Amino acid sequence: EYTGPHDRPLRKYPEVAIINGTLGPTGGIVQTPGVSESQKGYTVTSSSSWGNGGTDTRAGWCAFDEGKSTTTYKIWQSGNYYTTTTPGLYNRSPAQSHTADGVNYEGEWIKLELPRKINISAIEINAAAYSSLTGHVGGRPYEGAILGSNDDSTWSLLKSFSGGLSWATTTVAEGGGRVTLTPDTNTTNKYRYIMLVVNKIQGSRSSVDINEIKYYGHEEGSGSLDTTLKSVY
């Protein structure tokens, strides 16, 4: 009896931590675009990143390191492109902008390129408290969108959110807060590029600050790897 091919089991992506990537320049300056990194088939890019360089790098890849890097803060911090009001409004000029399904989404962004297409089931975002720097929690997303693409050009909406998110309290080491989003648009499609766009932040900060992002989903089925052959009597 032959069955298959099947989609593979639900997994976290990236499947491996992206650790000790490219360090930013010294001097506490904004990098536009942000410091990028490619490891083990994954590439992380962002619209901007900030940090004092060296071990104080706060590049996009830090949001996928599972806290295992030797950098000091282990967070992605964008440039200072938001007002310090509550919520913080996006004010970069010219704005970073992506169109998905006919709707324009503005905001700083962080993008993961995967080695294979996946169907996204859930998105986990962890805020960015660290040690005594609990004020970074104010840089967590308040309004934005999750987008998917297969050519890094044409984008589709997976999930939009506005009016704030319901954050569960976590330990400071975990970022101080966690939210899980479930796609509700284009839910059956598979994508190779996944992007978080942040239009507003919670407030009292001028940057997006994120400890960790985890995508959960299924890879495309593979006839060579995902088939089952059974003897039938």
Q: Which residue stretches match the model-derived regions?
A:
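Solvent-exposed, conformationally flexible loop/turn segments
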Residues: 168-176
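Aromatic, loop-rich ligand-recognition surfaces of beta-strand-rich domains
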Residues: 1-33, 49-61, 67-159, 177-229, ...
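Autoprocessing Asn-cyclization modules and mimics
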Residues: 44-46
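Solvent-exposed serine/threonine-rich low-complexity stretches and specific carbohydrate-binding patches
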Residues: 157-169
